[in-house]
Amino acid sequence: MLLIYNIDMRLHTYLEHILGNKATISILRVLFNYKGKTFTERGLAKVSNLSNVEASRTVDQLEKFGIVRIQPVGKAYQISLNDRSYILNKIVQPSLMAEKETLDALIRLLKKHLDTKKIVSATIFGSVVKGEEKEDSDIDLLVISDDFDYATEVVANASEEISSTFGTRISPIIFTRKDFTSKARNDLIRSILSNHILVTGIELEKLK
């Protein structure tokens, strides 16, 4: 069950053994999101959506690199992050923090382009807001502006930078304020109103 590595892998070329598979990332993400909490192997496997065997094997490997601590408690084992770990603090934690802040960074970039007087409101909606996006999902963006040509231009500029920075695309909908108000009872607009994130401008509810 324990995986044995050459000692030089712990001080030199070891990243592929820590970050090289989905199970390891899943467990590290859970432990990071619930930092300070201890898990049993079974509990950690459940939250990480892994089998007990896969979770146990992965935890053993993480302990070998000093990233987690395993403490026997009765017949069970309790797992927690090793806060003193170099690998955790210098590599794993910054990576997970950057992942967690990706959406906020994307919103800031959008705001840089759309935070102007001619944009009445801009919001993102859809699968990204719900946390259900897939690899090929676009960023659904609703822009309200009474200057369609201007809005189209700034959205195109934002889309280009979003693509080069995040490797994803914007799927925009551009309405005038009047058009948005007239479509307020439309199923799509009602869906957007129920679940969106304001990027800049006036909150949608105030525009109905």
Give the location of each predicted region.
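A structural signal for short, well-ordered beta-strand segments
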Residues: 124, 141, 170-172
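Short gly/ser-rich loop at a beta-strand->alpha-helix junction or flexible surface loop bordering the NTP-binding
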Residues: 119-129, 143
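Catalytic core of pol beta-like nucleotidyltransferases
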Residues: 2-118, 130-136, 148-208
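Short acidic, glycine/proline-enriched helix-loop-strand junctions
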Residues: 137-144
